């Protein structure tokens, strides 16, 4: 493991739907709420998870492993992006936790991405997660979200 400081990105939103409904949207096959990516996994601990799509005109194929699932409260997985130009070794994988909590008649969704190599990349990741959560919250075309 490296002694280089690592960084964390966090994004949170409120969705005016119950956790079961948000979980269903989050895990729906073909739900392209993460940067328009196609997400493939069976959501079982130990299973692979892949994200494929286009980002600023570049094709990407990110990967990881599902670490934990507690429906409808937690999705925890590792993540590696070849676009990072980092070596594909465990030390360079992010850990991402998506937590759903009942909140004021809806759901508070918090995404935490850990083990990011630079402060600049952490800030960019936070922005991407805010965008992803906005997409998740507006999936039905409505305006049912507030960012915090």
PLM features per residue range, with description:
Residues 6-12, 48, 61, 74, ...:
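Intrinsic-disorder/low-complexity, polar/charged segments enriched in Ser/Thr/Lys/Arg/Asp/Glu/Gln
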Residues 39-42, 57-104, 114:
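Hydrophobic-ligand binding "helix-grip"
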Residues 27, 107-112:
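Ser/Thr-centric signal marking residues that sit
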Residues 22, 49-51, 66, 77, ...:
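Hydrophobic pocket/interface hotspot
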Residues 1-40:
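Hydrophobic ligand-binding cavity/cleft-lining segments
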Residues 27-28, 71, 138-142:
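Residues at helix-coil transition
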Residues 92, 114-148:
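A conserved amphipathic terminal alpha-helix motif
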Residues 19, 38-51, 58:
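A solvent-exposed, acidic/Ser-Thr-rich amphipathic alpha-helical stretch
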